[in-house]
Design a protein with these regions (language model features):
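Catalytic donor nucleotide-activated moiety binding site of glycosyltransferases and closely related
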Residues: 41-45, 69-119
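A short acidic (Asp/Glu
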Residues: 50-52, 86-91, 151-153
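A generic structural motif
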Residues: 97-108, 160-177
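A donor-sugar binding/catalytic signature common to diverse glycosyltransferases
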Residues: 126-170
Length: 218
């Protein structure tokens, strides 16, 4: 199983640097200690290789978990690349949501594509999110890597895995719509974003045609 193999290699080869662990420890001491901690990883932006799970689906599952286990006091750590998701979860769980000061996006462009952000900062943010998720007492995750890696970092972490309910998207990757376009996030400046999406797809089609043309003329 991939997860078992991942846990084996993480335990054997991955050693997190002390200054990263200190940042994790400081955040955890401030927001997640002395109460039941729930980790949530939810992808937005350009996520497209599987059907995205909506915030409403997460929230319903979280309430069910709390009710089933009679949990009254808890804190929720949210790891996400989409700014709008923070607003949704804070509205549903006021005063209980924490999140690391990571790079996030307000649209369909994933933060790791941001050219004006230092690449080390991008990587550090994701690593800290993974470590904080792994230190929670229960995890809700979708079909994306960060939540999965949290399970590799902590083999005893219990979770609800929406990936088991999420269909893999078929067809050419460059033509798929990302989660930002598929999930209802309120006003997105829809016309401008639709034009941006069409332009993005058109550019990718041109790149594919160019590659085919160059291959045929080698």
């Amino acid at each position: 199983e991939k997860r078992a193999l991942g846990r084996k290699y993480v335990a054997k080869y991955i050693k997190v640097k002390p200054h990263i662990l200190q940042k994790v420890s400081d955040f955890q001491a401030k927001y997640l200690e002395n109460t039941y901690s729930i980790g949530v990883h939810i992808r937005g932006t350009d996520f497209s290789y599987a059907k995205p799970t909506s915030p409403e689906t997460y929230i319903e599952a979280i309430h069910h978990h709390l009710d089933e286990n009679k949990i009254k006091e808890f804190n929720l750590f949210l790891a996400t690349d989409q700014v709008q998701f923070i607003e949704v979860f804070e509205k549903e769980f006021p005063g209980r949501v924490s999140y690391y000061n990571a790079i996030r996006s307000e649209n369909h462009v994933a933060p790791f594509h941001f050219k004006d952000v230092n690449n080390y900062k991008k990587g550090e943010d994701v690593l800290i999110d993974m470590l904080l998720l792994s230190n929670c007492q229960f995890l809700f995750k979708g079909a994306a890597a960060v939540g999965e890696y949290a399970l590799w970092l902590n083999p005893t972490l219990s979770c609800y895995d929406f990936a088991l309910e999420s269909d893999i998207e078929r067809g050419r990757y460059s033509l798929r719509k990302g989660a930002f376009f598929k999930i209802d996030l309120g006003d997105k400046g829809s016309m401008k974003l639709k034009i941006t999406y069409i332009q993005q797809v058109f550019r990718q089609i041109l790149e594919q045609v160019k590659l085919i043309f160059e291959k045929d003329h080698d």
